[in-house]
From Swiss-Prot:
Name by which UniProt lists this protein: Pleckstrin homology domain-containing family A member 2
Membrane topology: Peripheral membrane protein
GO MF annotation terms: fibronectin binding; laminin binding; lipid binding; PDZ domain binding; phosphatidylinositol-3,4-bisphosphate binding
Quaternary structure note: Binds MPDZ and PTPN13.
Phosphoserine sites (modified residues): S184, S314, S349
Covalent crosslink: Glycyl lysine isopeptide (Lys-Gly) (interchain with G-Cter in SUMO2): K141
A GO cellular component annotation in the UniProt record: plasma membrane
Cited function: Binds specifically to phosphatidylinositol 3,4-diphosphate (PtdIns3,4P2), but not to other phosphoinositides. May recruit other proteins to the plasma membrane.
Organism: Mus musculus
Gene3D superfamilies in UniProt: Pleckstrin-homology domain (PH domain)/Phosphotyrosine-binding domain (PTB)
Region spans: Disordered: 310-425
Pfam families documented for this protein: PH (PF00169)
Subcellular location: Cytoplasm; Cell membrane; Nucleus
Any Gene Ontology biological process: positive regulation of cell-matrix adhesion
Amino acid sequence: MPYVDRQNRICGFLDIEDNENSGKFLRRYFILDTQANCLLWYMDNPQNLAVGAGAVGSLQLTYISKVSIATPKQKPKTPFCFVINALSQRYFLQANDQKDLKDWVEALNQASKITVPKAGTVPLATEVLKNLTAPPTLEKKPQVAYKTEIIGGVVVQTPISQNGGDGQEGCEPGTHAFLRRSQSYIPTSGCRPSTGPPLIKSGYCVKQGNVRKSWKRRFFALDDFTICYFKCEQDREPLRTIPLKDVLKTHECLVKSGDLLMRDNLFEIITTSRTFYVQADSPEDMHSWIEGIGAAVQALKCHPREPSFSRSISLTRPGSSTLTSAPNSILSRRRPPAEEKRGLCKAPSVASSWQPWTPVPQAEEKPLSVEHAPEDSLFMPNPGESTATGVLASSRVRHRSEPQHPKEKPFVFNLDDENIRTSDV
């Protein structure tokens, strides 16, 4: 939406066709300056650009003959499109919605009207000649401190303020060359996949840094529990996450000083540890963010709850899988009791299993009989030991690495028995 800034200029984002009949529209920040009698467009809000970054295009208002809504025949696939006719050239621009389209067309037509000056306002010819003959004086440019860095083998000079911090207009070069068309919207299914609760509001805003106090454009996303901002819309990991339970207040920033004095549509998010200064693209967008954050904080206070997606994220971390534990639990529940008991016999208990450093118990135990012990089991009974009934009398069986328990009879066979085999002797 176009808005009026502190210098009484009409500002806002529009999409302009790169070349006539090319069909390629680029996102630009437009400033309609009636005092300078021109329409300017920049890569982004000049407050967010580097010092010295000028307009990428301009048009004198006196050259504009007509501003009208584009017909479907002119731009059949471009909604909310209007055309500026100037000097036998046409400029096609695209607004965000119908109201934005109507406001821009009315503002441009009003600014480009030819007005007849009143009597006494026309300058005298002598004054005009005097101004023309006067030699132009070179304006003395203010001295600006620069910080020189070597990035990737290239010398980069960044303007800084005298207090040692970043410049007020510090910004990454080339960051805003490809701005998204929609600056604030509820994302659809084709956007960045959401891994948490559904988003209440999302869009691009300009945020002040905490350390260097530089202003950079970030993609903000608001859900039921947090406010996150990303470097761009396609990023999956946020640069920072602000829990809504830590937000104390969100309102328009009315008390401004220093760099904040020239910022329009500025609001602040006050938390327990820090105050975030965020600049929206229009007053409507600013009030929408303030109302959305306030409503989410109030809903969280009235109905406190934990995010339900935290456990699902922990279960699907890299290196683990939710499918590995679920089938095992299902199979263990469906397994027959005998089979389950046999599986448990193979896994020694940590509390009761024998270890090499454990002393051999002196009390005699009755282990599992040979006929009931599996042949391939690691837990074997002592040779020759068996109960008369063949019933397991002990709670655990001896592992093959465990020493045998001392016996009263050193030889377990009776030599007078006629049924004894020679191999047993």
